[in-house]
């Protein structure tokens, strides 16, 4: 009889813990963080002459993988160190979520590359069912490009051993 009670007690405890996990999963809160920079050499990555951008606008958009419908959208503006933070409530396991550049505060550095190979957005995973323990999601840095590269760019590219790459 004692063995049977222990089994029932164990099963009951597991059920309670399972329900607590389900209740907690419904309360997913994430924070998406990232930064925006000015790509002063027009090469799609940061260099020592890149500058951070205060006042740049980005948007986070999630779309359902199968239906393609928008399930979440939010915008944020970068602070004085070029960083943004977007609070997100909910779990978007069945979605593709991306950060995109929207608006630059600098008319000299406001182009977004539309080349096929260029990084036009930063994907983030907004689900607690992916093995990430933290609720903070870090997006890759995104950059607006200057209309013309800085005169220092050929030297910068040479320092990086990128002799065949030309700042365009």
From Swiss-Prot:
Its main location: secreted. InterPro entries: Allergen_Ole_e_I_CS (IPR006040), Pollen_Ole_e1_allergen (IPR006041). Keywords: Allergen, Disulfide bond, Glycoprotein, Secreted, Signal. This is Pollen allergen Cro s 1. Glycans are attached at residue 64. Transmembrane segments: none annotated. Expressed in pollen. It comes from the Eukaryota. Residues 1-26 form the signal peptide. Disulfide bonds join 38-109, 41-153, 62-97. It is found in: Secreted. One of its GO terms (cellular component) is extracellular space. Belongs to the Ole e I family. Coiled coil: none annotated.
